[in-house]
Amino acid sequence: METMITREDDSPRVAEMVRQCNFGEIQSYGPISVIPVLGEGKASGPEYVSLSEALEDGLIEVTEVSEGGDVPYLNVKNLSARKVLLLDGEELMGAKQNRVLNTTVLVSEEDELTIPVSCTERGRWRYKGKTFEDSNLIMAKKTQYLKSSSVSKSLCVNESYDSDQGGVWNSIDAMHAKYGSGSHTAAMKHVYDQQGDLLSAYVEKFPCVEKQRGVVVFVDGELAGCEMISRNQPYLRCHEKIIKSFCIDLLHRKIEKEEKTGSLDKAKDWLDSIEKWKSERFKSLGIGDDLRLKNGVSHGNALLADETIVHFVGFGPQVLEN
């Protein structure tokens, strides 16, 4: 891997991506408020399809790296003439155990990569099939924040995309304990499955709107995070996953008639502040560069390719309070 590069223009580049977008009407349900981020005009940068679409159409194949497998790594083979975007935190299910992506990767046409992952099912190490499928989930944002922060530390210390696997397992265990969910393999997916009705209620309140490319999310009126993708169609395929990842930690909360909501001014202030965050750049395992951004307890990472921010996920202070 190439040496870390500190670039003063990377944080402003992410902030500029947001400034080029418009915002939709605020949507609120329970303690959560969502502001849709809308892309205007033709998208710039590389064209690609989402992981969900690629797996559905047989464009890529994801397997263990060998017959025996290796927990922190998977093999991705792009069988198509289209680029494929895999998002930080997206879960793949099957093979010897379920895993999530440790960082966002844009896989080139007809390319084959070894990608870094974290285990989200520590009670299973046996085959359910040779290939992985889309679990239709992104890990809970609090867990993703902790994982992403540990990956950023690994990049700075030894230039690897390794996560704190023990921390990921502990966070998943805490989710099971919170909801009293049962799972003989300690699978993260089982929490989502067993809370399906409550999650669906939130998803229905936060529909994807025309031209949407992202969300800014508030909890109890305070900013919890933001996620954006550079193209509308891939975002549409990921929207429900993203909404669930913000909501899963809050299903124990009662729905009150009067809840604090977010505001467009608060969203713009936080997004504008990204311009001044500390940023570090690393060579991505796929196309482009992996950007790591931090400002106090706020943290984010982005994929830069063809001078375009293809994906950005940012975590605000409130994500840790959930």
Where are these regions (language model features)?
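Intrinsically disordered, low-complexity Pro/Gly/Ser/Thr-rich segments with frequent PxxP/GP/PP motifs
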Residues: 3, 8-33, 38-39, 91, ...
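Edge strands and adjacent loops of beta-rich recognition modules
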Residues: 36-61
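Asparagine-centered strand-capping/turn motif at beta-strand->loop junctions
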Residues: 73-84
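Long, low-complexity, serine/threonine/proline-rich intrinsically disordered regulatory regions
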Residues: 2-17, 25, 151-322
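Glycine-centered loop/turn motifs
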Residues: 71, 87-90
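Short, solvent-exposed loop/turn segments enriched in Ser/Thr/Gly
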Residues: 67-73
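Short, surface-exposed beta-strand-loop junctions and turns on beta-sheet-rich folds
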Residues: 82-83, 92-94, 232-233
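Short, low-hydrophobicity acidic/polar segments
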Residues: 126-155
